[in-house]
């Protein structure tokens, strides 16, 4: 090589096919099918399947749910505050649907000494790996369903869209504020009742 000139083009020997799907920022976008959700509802008496339903009908990220503290859960008004999110836009109020409100109440009362809504059998804060490996994954395998916690979020967004919910309301609920137009951010405001009404339609 002389003067930065190479006599041979070696790029033709580089195989990029094996790397094309290795995007570290790519999430699993598969959503739960209706029959799969129905199967999970059949297990609703199990408190750990209840967590899956809480994820499906809130659209929160798994980290947001596991980090949710009781002090930020408002059962009477049917919403909770997400104050810990991976993005600034994720800080928001999330409505609690009527159909899963009893599960929030049950978890809220299940371990008075734990500050977190969800907790291990020992009353400790759930770490993601612990929750996924010991609970979510085995529960899905038991039902023959191949899904990840993030699929719950994507499913909620899809169900809201299919129910004809206003796109701005969907963005408010799931924390996609970064995708909002300036007009949506500045001039569009919804009270919690409107958000609860929206989540109750799925």
Q: What do the PLM-derived regions correspond to, one by one?
A:
Residues 6-8, 12-62, 66, 86-89, ...:
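Basic, Lys/Arg- and aromatic-enriched nucleic-acid-binding interface segment
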């Amino acid at each position: 090589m002389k003067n930065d000139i190479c006599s041979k083009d070696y790029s033709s020997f580089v195989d990029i096919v094996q790397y094309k799907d290795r995007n570290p920022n790519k999430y699993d976008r598969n959503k739960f099918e209706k029959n799969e959700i129905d199967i999970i509802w059949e297990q609703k008496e199990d408190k750990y399947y209840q967590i899956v339903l809480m994820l499906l009908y809130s659209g929160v990220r798994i980290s947001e749910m596991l980090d949710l503290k009781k002090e930020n859960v408002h059962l009477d008004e049917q919403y909770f505050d997400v104050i810990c999110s991976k993005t600034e836009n994720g800080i928001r109020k999330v409505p609690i649907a009527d159909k899963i409100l009893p599960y929030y109440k049950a978890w809220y009362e299940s371990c008075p000494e734990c500050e977190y809504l969800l907790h291990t059998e020992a009353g400790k804060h759930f770490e993601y790996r612990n929750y996924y490996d010991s609970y979510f994954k085995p529960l899905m395998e038991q039902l023959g369903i191949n899904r990840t916690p993030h699929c719950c979020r994507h499913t909620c967004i899809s169900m809201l869209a299919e129910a004809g919910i206003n796109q701005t309301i969907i963005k408010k609920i799931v924390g996609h504020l970064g995708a909002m137009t300036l007009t949506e951010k500045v001039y569009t405001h919804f009270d919690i009742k409107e958000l609860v009404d929206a989540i109750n339609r799925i």
